[in-house]
Amino acid sequence: MNIILSATITNSITESMKPALLVLGLILAALVISCIVFTAILARSGGISIGKKIVLAALYVTTLTVLLCTFLCFRQYQIMEDMSATETANSPSATQTTAAQETEATTEPPTEPPTEPPTEPDPTVAPAHTEKSDPANWKVKWSIMQNGTVLDSFQRNETIDFGDASQYSALDGIVTFRGDNYRTGASFGTTDMVSQTLTKKWSAKIGSLKGANGNWTGCGWTGQPLIVRWDDETKAILGLYEEKKEKEGLVEVIYATLDGHIYFYDLEDGSYTRDPIRIGMSFKGAGSLDPRGYPLMYVGSGDSTTKSPRMYIVSLIENKVIYEQSGSDIDAYRKWYAFDSAPLVAAEADTLIWPGESGILYTIKLNTAYNPSEGTITVSPENTAKTRYKTNTGHKTGCEASSIIVGNHIYYGDNGGMFFCVDLQTMELKWAQYTRDDINATPVFEWGEDGVGYIYIGTSMEYAKGNTYIYKLNANTGEIVWERKFTDVAYNERVSGGVLSSPLLGKKGTELEGLIIYPIARTPSVSSGTIVALNTETGETVWEVVNRNYHWSSPVAVYGSDGKAHFILCDSAGKATLYNAAGEVINTLSLGSNIEASPAVFENTFVVGTRGQTIYGVSIE
C-alpha cells in the first residue's frame, strides 16, 4: 500500500511541474530575444554610456539566471518522472492502467494481499535430568556399543524424528501394539452404536505349542492382533489368495499367536486371506507392521522352543521370514533373550528400534529395497548401535513392555521398575526414574495443555508385595507429577497381579477426555479385578468398578462420530464387556475361556484371541 501511495504522489508532483517549466521556458525565450535586440540597438547607436552598459549587463545576468533555473527545474522533472516509472513498475497494481490506479487511489483504500497465519511448530520434548531423575541416584552404568565395542560417544548418520502419533502410519488400521508411537490405543475409525450390543461375527480355531515349561495355547498376553486395510497397489503384490486380492476394500487381520503361527483373516467373515506362516516359536507380543506401508512385519518370540528367542522380519509378499536375529547376545548382562515388546520403525531413517528383555536396546539400519512395480522387497540389516545397563536396584533389567518414541527420544521401562529416556541420535541416557516394581504394562504418552509431554506408567506386583503403583511423569524432566498407590493387591507367585493392562487414555473431544483408565489385576482378591478411572491432571479417582474376574487384557475405546465414547475390556473368565464412559456395564459377551490378549477395534468390529485356542471377530452394534 505504501508503494502505491508513493507512486501516486510522485505522479502528482511531476504533473504540476509541467506548467512551471513552460512558463520558465517562455520567460527565458523573452529574455534571450531582449538581449539580442538590445545588444543590436546599442551597437548601431555607436557609443555606449555607462548607464546603458549596466542595463545590458543586468539583462544578461537575469537571462543566465533564468537559464540556470530552467535547466535545474527540467533536470528535477526528469528525475521525478524516472522515480514515478520505477515505483509504478514495483507496485502490485503495475499491470493496471493509470486511470485505474487513480480511481483506486481516490475511491477506496487499496486492499493488502492476504497473509497466511503463522504455522505453529509441532511441540517437542527437551529431556534433561534433574536432581530427582539423575541416573546416578540408582548408580546406572550405561554403555553404548557398536560391533562388540563400548564407545565413548556415538552420533547417528541418519536423523530420527518421529512425528505426532496421528502421522505414524501411512496405513489405515492398527499397525503395532496400542496403535502408534505414543501407544494411544488399539482402535481405528468410529462406530455409532444403535443397540449397544456385542455379537459374535466369526471364530477361528488355532493350536498350541510345547514350550520350555509346558504348553503355550491360543493367544496370550499381550497378544493384540494387527488390522490393516491395504491400498490397491500393495494388495496386488501381497501373498494373498487371488479372490482376496480382487476383493474391494479388503481389511486383513494379522495375528501372531502362542502356537508359533502368524494367521491371516478377512475381518468381514474370518476366512483365511492367505496360508498361515508357521515359524515354530511362541509369540506373546503383537509385533508391528512397517508404518511406511511396506509389506513387512516385525515380530519377536517369547519363549525358547526349537531355538533361542529372536526377532523376525517377515515378507508379506513371499509370506516367509527374510531375516532373523537371535536375542542371545554376548554383550547382554541378563541372559533372557525374548522380544515381547512391539518395535517401532523410524521411517525416514529406515531404522528399526527394539528394546529386548535382555536389557539391550537395539537400533538396526534396515537398508530396505522396495520395488512395488516389480513386487519385490528386501532388507539387509546392520546393527548400528545398541545400549546395555546396570543399576543398584537389585532387580531384573530388560524391557517386556513396548516403548514410546517422541521426536528422537525413546521412553521405556524395565522388569526392575526403572524407566528411561534415551536420545536416539546419540544413544545417551537423558534421565531415569524408579517406579518401585516391574513395568509389564506399556505406558502411554500425551501432550498437556501446557505444551509439555507426559507419560502414564503402571506397575505389576513382583517386588512390592501387596502394592501396585500408577505414575504420571514429566517427559522432559522425568520427575513424578503424581503417584497413586494401591495396597490391596493379592500376591500370587505364578500369576502376576497389579497393572498388566496397558491404560486407556481418553481421546480429546470425547466423553473419555481427561481420564486415564487402568485395570488392576488380583485386587481386592486373588481372582477379582478393579478398574479405576483417574483424572489425568490430579490422579484422583473419578470412578471405580470391582469385578469378580481380573484383567490382563487392555481396554480399547469405541468412539462415535459425535464424541460419544465406550470401551471394551476382556477378563480372565472369557467375558468381553462393553462399558460407557462412566464405567457402567452396557453389554457383555462370553467368549468361552481366559482372555489375556488385548483386542483391536476396526470401525464396528473388534478381534481378540483366547487361551482356549479360538480367535473371535465381534460386531459392535
Q: How should each PLM-predicted stretch be described?
A:
Residues I33-A58:
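Cytosolic-side transmembrane helix boundary signature
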Residues G51-R75:
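Internal/C-terminal transmembrane anchor helices
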